[in-house]
């Protein structure tokens, strides 16, 4: 595989789903994953020393306790997740390591699609992400073998994708982003190719998954009513199917007024099988999720108030995230910003990745006349006398930026000072997030308040903070670059990179085997559906026997980890399907037996 050192992919590393895009012939193109989908669940499963990412991991989300979801919520923290090894021992993983598995999966299939080795990326983050979270994202990219050229805010990426920078007038743009696991609202000012985030607000514990959960509660209540209080909330297999059915129903209700939830043989009780056949109307769906929708109202008001912008001054509304397809969401946004219909011309699941790819084009020089001016999401301060947090860079300051301020000593003849850096809006340093500290020594003894110590905060375009302290009398100085709060040393990062590289070939083999296993399991499920369908009664006995034989062969191959046999059985099924297609549909139109 050839290497293109100039190629930069754009990655939307989402809480629930991720997406990768690249510039081809001057246009952004979203790349499909091995399952033919344009977005990939941000889910990682660990099973028998295998690492499973994406849709395959999602399918075992409930049944496999070693499945990790929403790892993005832990970025920038010292929290770790624990997984069990086959021998019963446990292993702790940092959020960066888990996120790196997702990024590595995206990188690998992008390389296969493009046919070139990829080493550079632009990755998006929520506008509210702090310095630690941004650093953690860069570290995850590094572990995955990616040089993260730029971290950009998701709303900025969305505006880039919509080409609003091409307008010849200044525009105020509201970006409403309701993803699977988080909700953000941002207000951007765009003029002459320059982007500035004026304000941002949101709820990082609200997303489309919450709408799914309301449907699950609705179904569980129906089951309890119909089956004498039956509670399936602890039945892992049943909950996995309920989760999938709820998501399907939510999607259907965005396009139609009712959805049929059909779950045959959901479980078996003493009285026999439990079958669910339930109609959910859009009106009922909106009723049971009304409180969730209302939680998105205040953040819209907050960003308008903070930016001192009236609703009528908004020029454009952009909807981001698959959950914005829900009609109730669109109605709420229109009601709060009257006179404007939200722009939905780009797939909301893909728009952020597309914007990231365009930013990659900007960095390469392929896209001209675009300047991104993001903002810092929280105030950056130092702790001064009495534990006060004295701000140097205030919240929503445009970055990159550098700010300096003169401080002095708190005691007579003090020969050193501790510089404590914190982040947050609280007036006392102890109530804010501590980012780091360092010591400046060699100060000439003098009465307190006499020495002049210059503190400089420099925040780069990626939101990475460098803090420098300088004694203006002695010219002595010291500095610190704030690293992520996960406390990963460079040695630990390098070890993770080496481990990833050393295991790359093995991981590829494992991934291919997982794909085979997934295909085999999918075929078994398909065969069971065929045999349970009404049309199955018309099948000749020998055809049913063929299917039973294929099913048995696949199950045996999977249990024995015999991937050669598994591949052969998969081919047997494909041949059978082709024969059935010709037999039942000589004109080539595939009918029911070939489904």
From Swiss-Prot:
The modification Phosphothreonine is found at residue 182. Keywords: ATP-binding, Chaperone, Nucleotide-binding, Phosphoprotein, Stress response. InterPro entries: ATPase_NBD, Chaperone_DnaK, Heat_shock_70_CS, HSP70_peptide-bd_sf, Hsp_70_fam. One of its GO terms (molecular function) is ATP-dependent protein folding chaperone. Gene3D superfamilies: 3.30.420.40, Actin, Chain A, domain 4, Substrate Binding Domain Of DNAk, Chain A, domain 1. It holds the Pfam family HSP70. Induction: By stress conditions e.g. heat shock. Acts as a chaperone. HAMAP family: DnaK. Belongs to the heat shock protein 70 family. This is Chaperone protein DnaK. It comes from Mycoplasma pneumoniae (strain ATCC 29342 / M129 / Subtype 1).
